[in-house]
């Protein structure tokens, strides 16, 4: 099964919503998307992966170009306001050999367990993250995460990355 979305996909999470597991910007395995727009306001989302979930189940490798990638997102635009993300936010790449092109992520007045550029062998071309008035909390009810972490790469790779923190 495969999906190839040449247009934009928009995901909007409204105030009070709870995502009790993982939110994927892209899809699983053979799923490719041109643009993903994620907007969440006053929501609780256990974890977010900007790209997809490859899990090493496709023909992708760590160095597969985003245009040739069978699992990935070319453009990621993410805006999170007043959100709680207990297990963390992955701003580019994804799980397994997922590839993202350009990610632009804005986080304001939120609380996170961790933030990553790329995740678990994911790869990204460009990631820009702007965070304002955001805090990192060590322990969350319902989460096994026992630490705060900021990492540009959690295995995998990234060509260019920028994190900006204001009032955090």
Residue ranges and their predicted role:
Residues 1-21, 27-47, 52-88, 93-168:
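Surface-exposed loop/turn motifs in large extracellular/passenger domains
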């Amino acid at each position: 099964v495969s999906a190839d979305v040449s247009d934009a996909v928009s995901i909007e999470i409204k105030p009070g919503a709870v995502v009790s597991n993982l939110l994927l910007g892209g899809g699983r395995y053979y799923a490719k998307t041109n643009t993903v727009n994620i907007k969440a306001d006053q929501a609780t989302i256990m974890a977010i992966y900007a790209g997809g979930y490859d899990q090493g189940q496709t023909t992708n490798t760590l160095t597969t170009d985003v245009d040739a990638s069978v699992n990935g997102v070319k453009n990621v635009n993410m805006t999170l306001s007043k959100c709680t993300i207990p297990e963390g936010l992955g701003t580019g790449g994804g799980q397994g050999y997922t590839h993202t092109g350009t990610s632009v992520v804005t986080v304001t007045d939120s609380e996170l367990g961790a933030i990553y550029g790329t995740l678990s062998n994911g790869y990204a071309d460009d990631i820009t993250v702007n965070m304002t008035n955001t805090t990192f909390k060590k322990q969350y009810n319902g989460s096994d995460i026992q630490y705060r972490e900021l990492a540009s790469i959690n295995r995998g790779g990234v060509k260019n990355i920028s994190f900006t923190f204001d009032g955090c």
